[in-house]
């Protein structure tokens, strides 16, 4: 689950 969050955050930031 965390991997998905980090992926989105990485794309945004």
Swiss-Prot record:
It comes from the Eukaryota. Keywords: Amidation, Amphibian defense peptide, Antibiotic, Antimicrobial, Cytolysis, Fungicide, Hemolysis, Secreted. It is found in: Secreted. Expressed by the skin glands. Antimicrobial peptide with activity against Gram-negative and Gram-positive bacteria and fungi. Also shows hemolytic activity. The modification Phenylalanine amide is found at residue 13. One of its GO terms (cellular component) is extracellular region. This is Temporin-1SPc. Belongs to the frog skin active peptide (FSAP) family. Temporin subfamily. GO terms for biological process: defense response to bacterium; defense response to fungus; killing of cells of another organism.
């Amino acid at each position: 689950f965390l991997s998905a969050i980090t992926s989105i955050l990485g794309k945004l930031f």
